Regions:
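N-terminal acidic, glycine/proline-rich low-complexity segments
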Residues: 1-130
């Protein structure tokens, strides 16, 4: 039986691997990817999710931007990591990825409502779920 999941993450190299595994696992059906700021900025984590999806050619997964910052404290920035993506920001095929127009909170809500029994897998900060 296939398990429907949403991956809420802050993609660097580790979460990029998680996206690849979730897309390729025969028992998983990745319904959405929601991103947010973690050790990298929210723009960078979103870009990394798009790069990963473009690399594996699975362009039908909704991807959205989420929280820019933590709710309570200032974001701790890993400046050495934020200077560069760690992935390939110069990819020519990123234009084929259309970001979901909803923010991550709305995408989470809509996907959960439309997929009873879905599991939210979190690998980053939990701000989008707060």
């Amino acid at each position: 039986m296939t398990k429907k999941i949403i991956l809420d993450c802050d993609p660097g190299n580790d979460d990029a691997l998680g996206i690849i595994v979730a897309c390729g696992h025969q028992n998983l059906s990745l319904k959405a990817i929601t991103t947010g700021a973690g050790h990298l900025s929210y723009d960078r984590t979103f870009q990394n999710a798009c790069i990963t999806v473009a690399q594996i050619g699975n362009l039908n997964i909704p991807i959205s931007k989420g929280a820019k910052n933590p709710l309570v404290r200032h974001r701790l920035i890993a400046k050495v990591l934020d200077l560069q993506s760690g992935l390939d920001p110069e990819r020519n095929d990123l234009s084929s990825i259309t970001p979901d127009s909803r923010n991550s909170v709305q995408l989470l809500h809509d996907t959960i409502i439309n997929n009873p029994g879905i599991t939210v897998v979190t690998t980053g900060p939990l701000t989008n779920l707060s």
